[in-house]
């Protein structure tokens, strides 16, 4: 069946992918012919996710490496999977429930809600998998993993228990990012900074005990104070006046002469009456604001640091919903007598409380002033609500105890991070690491394997010494009720059975009948109190210890998604079981990831794998940059510049999208993506398709069979292209081995479009009518086969379709052996001759174009001087040169005729007479005018780029665009100058 005129990507892509899957082409070990393994882990996209350009870029690079290694015979595994994405998934499902008019999460209860989440996951959670298939991702989908799969859950819980028992996980009170909408702690990655128009309120805090001081109010030209006033207050500034209710100190810089003498004194907090100290800390900058800073350790990360250094209390004055928590808050009321106005703020939303505090400050005279202020406010990236730094009880990993192996592994080269600058980011984060908050107040996720029990033996309670509680003692225990208020005890275990044994050990040391109690699981502390009290009361009536129960309840929180995804490499390979896959593929070879999650994910995987199995998770980390729009701007919905990879695939085909991303994947440099580039690379695929159709029309595919070695060739053109094929194979392999994806793509582009389609196809046309026809058919078939093979990792669909429709194939292209030939195929004589021919044709074409010779006009050429090698090359290829350079013929002369353009090539020179062909004077004037305008434009660009204010204040993408335009202008100026110089030779 003859080839179609064009490649129909829309029809072929689904058909080809289905064929690959049915053939098991992507399964681990498929096509393996050597002992080496290659394993790469997909960064698991969120189960809620849809394919965006970052995914498309990242997975294209992974697929290239996977297909390349698979074709080279490596035992290859590209491990796919999805992340359960705790907060994102819970948000989606809650929104769906609300849209359908169903009860909310809290009304449903945990178990029923989680059933709904699993239903949603089964119905809608596979969207991104199908989208990755459209991109051509050759993952082993039979091993598709999910971070909530039972085996993965076992791994996560085991690691938590192990790290807890080693003392690396603990429960503590620290400041976290708190999302009031979802009522949970969130990671830094889930926080986005939003610039807002706001106010800076200046507040006056009165010095305690009637103290006063002299405050400078006028200064000379050198900044020295010239006048003072007596003050009995300090002025502080804040964008969040409602937090003043939790202030516990005022910080001043010890070098600030205005306030240094006040250090150690106190101010009285308005509304609250709390006396708070003035402390010395370098965080207070004398040059900013008033120089005195209100410190609220429980509601500001910087203030928390000051509080830790200076010993200030931390008082939380908000609930998880960001409403004011005052009246029943013992921390707030301790040591002070809040005013009625302060207590009236209890229960108000933080923003309403802000208005009331400002109004009260104005009424009572402690509002010093208001300044308009544009500043950044952190928001939850999903809730779009301003987050609150919140002091809460959370679970933490004591990262300081486990980071050193992760640092050492990169420093010693066990794991390499590329580009090198990203290794610095990695080190910076690890060397300045804080304890990692791993608990989230959500329901969807890995529930923390910790159970709590009541402290049923209060410290102040004693029995009569007979190790048995009688009726009176049990009644006293109930009446005392101390276990209602004491902090609960807790144990950590893999499951309830394991934790029951630990609680039973605790109970064994208690008097009878408590030591006979059965451990049962209940939902909450409140239920535990009720069940225990009822059990003790019942025992007093029936004295039957078999009915005595000790209720425990599981921590309701779940683990941070990054905790489970931090175990992705070993968890997907079957750990903690000793699976064959774990033994064979771990540690993995390379991780390809974006720079934005180096510290959130990459560093944590390094930390976790080394802490758990004492091995690095991967040998190389390749960090790619961002995909931006064609002007260098970050893609965002608000700017309307988002490119949807699926829409691009629909319009241009997956191969064009993949090749574009690959060709632009310069290490460490952001991509500037445009549809024009994608269209251009679609044309590249069309060029290869047309070359194969040309081959078909000339009988190349008749009886053609796949051959690893090139055919024996005698024709110079055939010997030359065989050598070029050997060269490009070496270039591609060297580039991919060094993760220079752009170099591989650009080498293939230059070879396929330039050497094969532009030159070899043209050179071969006359040979099909000579005795070299059979050899040329064999050579062209072999060369085009190699084009398909070498391009397949980047453009899998069109190459697989071409492979199936050309010649006789024993197996699919996806499993065809990668070539091993190289520069040994180069024939020096053929290479020298054809390079000379191409150089002459290109020089003539360039000269014609520069001086605007009409494209279809054939010109005579005068041979001025030529060595013996050149004469032989010209004699053998004269017809080709005349046809491809659009020449009438060659003559010889000792000197160039008047009005001729000279051309130099290796071993000689030629002249092209132009008198009467073009108006040389008019052409020079046109070029000069164009050059003058270009110089003017470039001068403007240089002026902007030489202006420090422009470079410092303009958006990065605007500066980059100016630099790009200047570079393009320099290139254009060089071309115009060269053309003018050529014309100046003539007249």
Curated annotation (Swiss-Prot):
Residues 917-987 form a coiled coil. Keywords: Aminoacyl-tRNA synthetase, ATP-binding, Coiled coil, Cytoplasm, Ligase, Nucleotide-binding, Protein biosynthesis. GO terms for biological process: valyl-tRNA aminoacylation. A motif ('KMSKS' region) lies at residues 634-638. It catalyses: tRNA(Val) + L-valine + ATP = L-valyl-tRNA(Val) + AMP + diphosphate. Its main location: cytoplasm. A motif ('HIGH' region) lies at residues 45-55. ATP binds at residue 637. GO terms for molecular function: aminoacyl-tRNA deacylase activity; ATP binding; valine-tRNA ligase activity. SUPFAM superfamilies: Anticodon-binding domain of a subclass of class I aminoacyl-tRNA synthetases, Nucleotidylyl transferase, tRNA-binding arm, ValRS/IleRS/LeuRS editing domain. Gene3D superfamilies: HUPs, Isoleucyl-tRNA Synthetase, Domain 1, Valyl-tRNA synthetase, C-terminal domain, Valyl/Leucyl/Isoleucyl-tRNA synthetase, editing domain. It is found in: Cytoplasm. One of its GO terms (cellular component) is cytosol. Pfam families: Anticodon_1, tRNA-synt_1, Val_tRNA-synt_C. InterPro entries: aa-tRNA-synth_I_CS, aa-tRNA-synth_Ia, Anticodon_Ia_Val, M/V/L/I-tRNA-synth_anticd-bd, Rossmann-like_a/b/a_fold, tRNA-bd_arm, tRNAsynth_Ia_anticodon-bd, Val-tRNA_synth_C_sf. Its EC number is 6.1.1.9. Catalyzes the attachment of valine to tRNA(Val). As ValRS can inadvertently accommodate and process structurally similar amino acids such as threonine, to avoid such errors, it has a 'posttransfer' editing activity that hydrolyzes mischarged Thr-tRNA(Val) in a tRNA-dependent manner. ValRS has two distinct active sites: one for aminoacylation and one for editing. The misactivated threonine is translocated from the active site to the editing site. Belongs to the class-I aminoacyl-tRNA synthetase family. ValS type 1 subfamily. Monomer. This is Valine--tRNA ligase. The gene is valS.
